[in-house]
Amino acid sequence: MAAMKMEELRKQFLNCLQAADAFNIQPWQCTTKVVTYAQDSYGNRLKPVAVGQLSCKEEAAGKVRVFAMVDIWTQSVLKPLHDFLFSILKSIPNDATFDQNAAVERCFTKARKSGCSFGYDLSAATDRLPVRLQVSILSSLIGRPAARLWAELLVNRDYYLSHKKGQVMETDSFRYSVGQPMGALSSWAMLALTHHLLVQYACSRVRKGTFS
């Protein structure tokens, strides 16, 4: 049953991309046109609104985490893929996405058995983990054309960040040149799946096989 659900979600995402392609529509272009020609109740054309924005959140130890916000059209296209990737994460025994307490207990049990424990983290993964690597991994799940479109949808657009300079608010535009924007649906799930595969690959480099 779970496998059937995963396949259904995968097909839904591919159907969304095929529908857009049939009408020669790229979601980010469509969004730009919609906000450009929007009007208020008096018929006056509204000022175009940025459809990709960045927001910064200060965390402990001086760390600043950058979140990206995209438009509803992009999120709607990505939702089936988002659910599909999370269904894969849910099937991985050592993934803690859906039950962190169970994962901690599992780590304790394995550490007591082996007499040691190791932890891994990706530094600046959002910005620096190559989206090309993620496309390569995603290609094995949904095909290379769809995987490349996924990346295009996320990084082939401007993201705007407003900040105060003196007494004036200024806005700068940025593009992701290496990683991908954390905040869009499917983004975090793809990062987590890539992390799993990187750890397994590292293990295969030092010993034969994978681990659980």
In which residue ranges do the predicted regions lie?
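Viral RNA-dependent RNA polymerase
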Residues: 1-212
